[in-house]
Amino acid sequence: MTGSISGEADLRHWLIDYLVTNIGCTPDEVDPDLSLADLGVSSRDAVVLSGELSELLGRTVSPIDFWEHPTINALAAYLAAPEPSPDSDAAVKRGARNSLDEPIAVVGMGCRFPGGISCPEALWDFLCERRSSISQVPPQRWQPFEGGPPEVAAALARTTRWGSFLPDIDAFDAEFFEISPSEADKMDPQQRLLLEVAWEALEHAGIPPGTLRRSATGVFAGACLSEYGAMASADLSQVDGWSNSGGAMSIIANRLSYFLDLRGPSVAVDTACSSSLVAIHLACQSLRTQDCHLAIAAGVNLLLSPAVFRGFDQVGALSPTGQCRAFDATADGFVRGEGAGVVVLKRLTDAQRDGDRVLAVICGSAVTQDGRSNGLMAPNPAAQMAVLRAAYTNAGMQPSEVDYVEAHGTGTLLGDPIEARALGTVLGRGRPEDSPLLIGSVKTNLGHTEAAAGIAGFIKTVLAVQHGQIPPNQHFETANPHIPFTDLRMKVVDTQTEWPATGHPRRAGVSSFGFGGTNAHVVIEQGQEVRPAPGQGLSPAVSTLVVAGKTMQRVSATAGMLADWMEGPGADVALADVAHTLNHHRSRQPKFGTVVARDRTQAIAGLRALAAGQHAPGVVNPAEGSPGPGTVFVYSGRGSQWAGMGRQLLADEPAFAAAVAELEPVFVEQAGFSLHDVLANGEELVGIEQIQLGLIGMQLALTELWCSYGVQPDLVIGHSMGEVAAAVVAGALTPAEGLRVTATRSRLMAPLSGQGGMALLELDAPTTEALIADFPQVTLGIYNSPRQTVIAGPTEQIDELITRVRARDRFASRVNIEVAPHNPAMDALQPAMRSELADLTPRTPTIGIISTTYADLHTQPVFDAEHWATNMRNPVHFQQAIASAGSGADGAYHTFIEISAHPLLTQAIIDTLHSAQPGARYTSLGTLQRDTDDVVTFRTNLNKAHTIHPPHTPHPPEPHPPIPTTPWQHTRHWITTKYPAGSVGSAPRAGTLLGQHTTVATVSASPPSHLWQARLAPDAKPYQGGHRFHQVEVVPASVVLHTILSAATELGYSALSEVRFEQPIFADRPRLIQVVADNRAISLASSPAAGTPSDRWTRHVTAQLSSSPSDSASSLNEHHRANGQPPERAHRDLIPDLAELLAMRGIDGLPFSWTVASWTQHSSNLTVAIDLPEALPEGSTGPLLDAAVHLAALSDVADSRLYVPASIEQISLGDVVTGPRSSVTLNRTAHDDDGITVDVTVAAHGEVPSLSMRSLRYRALDFGLDVGRAQPPASTGPVEAYCDATNFVHTIDWQPQTVPDATHPGAEQVTHPGPVAIIGDDGAALCETLEGAGYQPAVMSDGVSQARYVVYVADSDPAGADETDVDFAVRICTEITGLVRTLAERDADKPAALWILTRGVHESVAPSALRQSFLWGLAGVIAAEHPELWGGLVDLAINDDLGEFGPALAELLAKPSKSILVRRDGVVLAPALAPVRGEPARKSLQCRPDAAYLITGGLGALGLLMADWLADRGAHRLVLTGRTPLPPRRDWQLDTLDTELRRRIDAIRALEMRGVTVEAVAADVGCREDVQALLAARDRDGAAPIRGIIHAAGITNDQLVTSMTGDAVRQVMWPKIGGSQVLHDAFPPGSVDFFYLTASAAGIFGIPGQGSYAAANSYLDALARARRQQGCHTMSLDWVAWRGLGLAADAQLVSEELARMGSRDITPSEAFTAWEFVDGYDVAQAVVVPMPAPAGADGSGANAYLLPARNWSVMAATEVRSELEQGLRRIIAAELRVPEKELDTDRPFAELGLNSLMAMAIRREAEQFVGIELSATMLFNHPTVKSLASYLAKRVAPHDVSQDNQISALSSSAGSVLDSLFDRIESAPPEAERSV
């Protein structure tokens, strides 16, 4: 080392500085753990750098060294290490490393075993607690094999089901390992498991996995089964490009090497059960031969198929009792198990050099083979003894020196005695009788984990050696009589045993034998504990915890996990040690947060805040991006001082203390007092001289502190007197000169103390200048920010101005300052300032500086006496300086750090920057903060300054403690399997799902199992009726119950207990049904009968077989006596409409025939008499069960929620009912928010009960399909789109219309145009131009009846001054409906086409356009009701000349369009639904606490929900109007109130209990006088102003167009059109914060029977557009039905029609979610409807996101970029199978698992989307969404286009979404007329 480079840390800093200077990085971008290549060092750069290092270090440095040590940290460590001489000890040790018997250190371990074991510590606790992980096979594990023929099912039933199973083997963190979901699905879960556990093992070892890149690290992985690959390849149609690598055994090791970029050996080892111990042996050999420098040895085993179970069963190897009893007399075989284990190995000398924790030392190992024994799978005693002798010879120790052996110990009749004799013969011989060899086997706890068995035993043994204790061998009670333990000098450890004291290190052996004959044994020894050198273990006073993760969510998860651990198991670990491991022994990740703390309590609180994403002292949350290059140090003026500042820094920050000490002599000389003493003693600075000198001293010391952490200024700016410190830092002045300037300035100003003042005003500069115009002695002293200025002048005038500003409701306050600079009072001081500093000789700054002294920022100041005299007088142009720095021509700066003891300018800085450069990313930080721990505050700000990677913290001495490993974020990944349809099962029996019955004998003495199999088909249901739930057929619960009850009856049981319903059975497609009864348990499961992506078994119900028939009858009688009698005071009620009650809950139909004869209700009891038909082919049990289940769910008629059965504690069957009449008695025993519990008894009149259910529990569903548990209908598209309410919101997108060709079904060749009639406003000119195009004018005497084309030109003016918009709409509706009637009555051989022309409705700017807008809704209904006579509706511009439109109309007449058409500038536009996307334009709604909010229709069910919603958003005052008044409050308690009125009152009271003032007013919103009276009364009472409107009033009156009457139309339009117009006039744009109009999707989709309602809602849509254009936050919300409310009958009709496309109604919760979502966007009209993505040809919906190619050239550049980003995001997210909203546009595709196959698929879809041919390497050349969009933008629109041209064109193949909807709706039956 040279004088300037004294160690590794110095060399690291030198390398960072070199890269910053020569490669062009910023310090924040230089990650010392990234490879030099990743940091931009090319081969040429490496050659130059090697020469620089050779000269610096005085030794030869080769460029090759950069490849062997590829990171800054690794290179610094290598170059700083002493170079060994040939005869040095190091050389001797290096030679020793080549020895084949060098000890190997175990430095890290990881494991995952059943029983909740996820780490070595958990395994130790598990073993010491004598626990066992053995259980029966998980219910779904073998489901793919349960759908075979009966003989297969029988074999499966006879197969042992005992095992040790991991849960959730389908769970994997694919994103973390940068693997796409598609590839992860095809990966053997053993590969996935190994990736996670290996990462955990490396973290346990304290080795950041990222540091192993390109290193000679070997991977040796034991595995012996590839069942997943076999399953995945069984169906060739499912095999893809991932299948081979996903299922290959070799990839198990290679996958880890690939992900970590390891260059050592990568070997998959398969020697069956000895695989993992052989892997350890091979890893040790590879380390000793220097094939690798670090080795990862592993074993993994998963049991996915029953085939191997079956094979071992056949030879009697598996324990029928489900226990591994190694060495016990009752041993009857082993139990198979799952798990994974990983160990990290190093040569011992390397581990000691690196300060690693050495958990144990491998002294030797050996591997042999049985050769030819008594059979391939039979053990060979001689071979076992040979491997033991070889291992101990290799270890260099006597066999008698080993204390304990972890035996193979499977618990088999043959294997245990053979192994015991081999151990005793080799290792037991010569031992004293009282010191036997101790043996045990982990298989007694975990089962035989096969390929992972050796490493399981190895990890257990390492833990035992560490802890000095040996866990007990489970299930050892009586020694195996075939093993002479005493003679062999061996003992089985049957209790927790202390390690015997032997006088030598603890030593143990581990054995593992493969069933093919490969034997392995490893010898280990206790490792030596590493202790830090004396004096090196001092803990820092403040610690920084760096919590890293690939995403912000992962950072949060890690922080929460660490907090839990520090409060629990890690409570004794020192905070500094936690920081040590976290900061230096974890991999760097793209995102990180930091926590700075002095103690554990602060650290835990900070971690909790970081986990929650909250702000807290010391916490810096992950940055969303880098602010860009360039750092500015900003030096504030006076005011940041506080007593105690810097005291902690002096104690805890050496760089700060050194800076103060270096400054101290000159400071004392200039200031006359000690800066050190003031800071150390926490003294207060008093007087202008002390304050100004103390602050500059503080600023100079803080500057050195920042620089010591690598944060250097690129530019400096000083504010007022802060410019002195800035000049010193820039190099223009020395510290002594700076202190002299400050001392002179403060001394001259001191006599003026108290003679003037300054004030901070919340005003911009022009406003301030206007304010002080009348005060000539007051000046604008400081331009602080666009919103802040500071004035200076006489105190009295300053106070007067403060009063004036506060009167404007603006902030104004005096500045606490002794002397006010920057005003004319300074003029008298300037000469003295020039004189006293005349000899000042400043230098040229070495760092850029912007002076705030001059208005012209381009002034290059000379920091001499003249400058400082001017500085104290001139205004401070701080705002201008900051704006210039943030957007300068020489390059913008993005990080601004205020160097002061308290932040005064940070907010002003950020305000200025955001005003100057909106949308740019900047960071504005302080340094310290008043009255806080200044070390914690500084470190926190330091961390905020590092956004790319955290600041480097000193590396404490080793060892480091282990802390919890990375928390995974698992998602499910599994293959799909497919079986041929109809291969299994017969049709089910009538009334049940039971099919063919098979009895299956079991291996043990247990009773036989029973299996019923059937095939359920939609066209062959076992019940006569239907049971449709939201348009999907669901097998009723009664049939499911009847099924398992019938099976129980066949087995001699008449009762069931513990019935649990898990999933519904959807009967919309064929399904295979299995009922299995085994050992008093019964269950029903199903699987799709045909191969589909969801082809897996689903369990629907489980129960316990219970009680004998006699017991059951007794129970029934007792239960009937208790609950079967109706209460004495019961009264008979009217029989409710059962079908209506069910329909309200989304259920259509009954599966069985039964009717209600009487209904008697009292309190919680209900008795219902039911009648059954005389002929019941399926018997009476099914109908009775069906009645009981349905009626119990309806026991509270007033509760309209949907209830589904969840469980039954007991259900019993009695005698079969023979009569037609039975009674169902219901007793509701519990009723809460989650559901109800009911006891049910069914009996014929006066007879013994035939059915009893105790504690029938229903759960309430808020969402019809309960998609969290059940599959939605297949036609609904992706579940996410079906369930995420934010996906329900659409806008209307107007796109150029597709012109159909002559062969199009909707096109008609017009060779002989027929007569045309023009009706309505100004049709003469239009008629003339049509005549010129060949159309004949109709004879008007009978024109309409004879015309081929009828064109109605909408009137644009009212009939008179008093005609309101409602009157106008009624009049025009009457005219048009009469016209439709006339045309509809024409003969079929005289077709006609009706067209309507409107003007300006699209924009709705003019009143005449708004008035016509209702016609849009009416037009859609006419098209739906009368498609045979509908032509279309065309909207012209408001000023279009009808005569000029004639030729275009002539072309359109022959092309009927169900869509509304808009013609602008010669282009015809058609509507399409478009999802709402992009960034929100406003924050979520928050009501003002001092305002009131009006809801019309507010007393209805919908209005009251909206009132509650507003209350949730802070509304304190609500005005609810309705046409029906509420009774006086004194009558609110009366029992005579009806249910509906009671519901309204209860809702209002609930609001009032929340603190909301509710004013319920009876008013007709359509009546202008009523509304004016309401507002006038509020004004008189001084009520709070109304700041928001929700117009929810409305009624429906269903009529077909041909039946509509004027009165009916008026009734519907009055509240909608009339009410909205009254509200619009009463609350003009700008008077309210929001104006919401509750409309209906009927106005969009054209629902038969809804002409007037659709028309009224279209008016609301237009009014919203009109107000929005006037700057008012107005939105029309076009809803479908709200479930349970029936917003209107029309909305239900919309839902019924949309259900054919997979849509549905929505819950209130979903409605409000959608509302809140769309409210953030600048949208006038929102269509809220669940719309599935359109399915592809195969029904998969894979192409749902594709859009026709656009005409990019006519779009603005910003729009092109936005469209491309959104479209590409959809395409790529779909292919990568990640949620679109989680696809970061800046994240490289490679991190998401992109590969060439996926790239080709994305390329194809992108070509269709963009419309141009794309390169195959496109995604790799442009690896993020953002960069790809930028590239494509240049391809498709190379020239910037005006922002005004926003029209996008569709290709000729494009179709309108609405066209499709109308096509579906037009088939509505003509009898759609109905009443509400």
Curated annotation (Swiss-Prot):
Region of interest (Disordered), ranges: 1104-1130
GO BP terms: Actinobacterium-type cell wall biogenesis; fatty acid biosynthetic process; phenolic phthiocerol biosynthetic process; phthiocerol biosynthetic process
Catalytic reaction equation(s): icosanoyl-[(phenol)carboxyphthiodiolenone synthase] + 2 (S)-methylmalonyl-CoA + 3 malonyl-CoA + 5 NADPH + 10 H(+) = C32-carboxyphthiodiolenone-[(phenol)carboxyphthiodiolenone synthase] + 5 CO2 + 5 NADP(+) + 5 CoA + 2 H2O; docosanoyl-[(phenol)carboxyphthiodiolenone synthase] + 2 (S)-methylmalonyl-CoA + 3 malonyl-CoA + 5 NADPH + 10 H(+) = C34-carboxyphthiodiolenone-[(phenol)carboxyphthiodiolenone synthase] + 5 CO2 + 5 NADP(+) + 5 CoA + 2 H2O; 17-(4-hydroxyphenyl)heptadecanoyl-[(phenol)carboxyphthiodiolenone synthase] + 2 (S)-methylmalonyl-CoA + 3 malonyl-CoA + 5 NADPH + 10 H(+) = C35-(phenol)carboxyphthiodiolenone-[(phenol)carboxyphthiodiolenone synthase] + 5 CO2 + 5 NADP(+) + 5 CoA + 2 H2O; 19-(4-hydroxyphenyl)nonadecanoyl-[(phenol)carboxyphthiodiolenone synthase] + 2 (S)-methylmalonyl-CoA + 3 malonyl-CoA + 5 NADPH + 10 H(+) = C37-(phenol)carboxyphthiodiolenone-[(phenol)carboxyphthiodiolenone synthase] + 5 CO2 + 5 NADP(+) + 5 CoA + 2 H2O
Gene3D superfamilies: 3.40.47.10, ACP-like (1.10.1200.10), Malonyl-CoA ACP transacylase, ACP-binding (3.30.70.250), Malonyl-Coenzyme A Acyl Carrier Protein, domain 2 (3.40.366.10), NAD(P)-binding Rossmann-like Domain (3.40.50.720), Polyketide synthase dehydratase (3.10.129.110)
Needed co-factor(s): NADP(+); pantetheine 4'-phosphate
Biased composition (Low complexity): 1106-1115
Domain Ketosynthase family 3 (KS3): 101-526
Enzyme nomenclature, EC number: 2.3.1.292
Region of interest (Acyltransferase), residue spans: 624-950
Active site, renumbered: 273, 408, 448, 720, 1027, 1186
Carrier domain span: 9-83, 1759-1836
Keyword Transcription annotated: no
MF GO annotations: 3-oxoacyl-[acyl-carrier-protein] synthase activity; fatty acid synthase activity; oxidoreductase activity; phosphopantetheine binding
Domain of life: Bacteria
Residue sites binding NADP(+) per the record: 1492-1551
Name this protein carries in UniProt: Phenolphthiocerol/phthiocerol polyketide synthase subunit A
Gene: ppsA
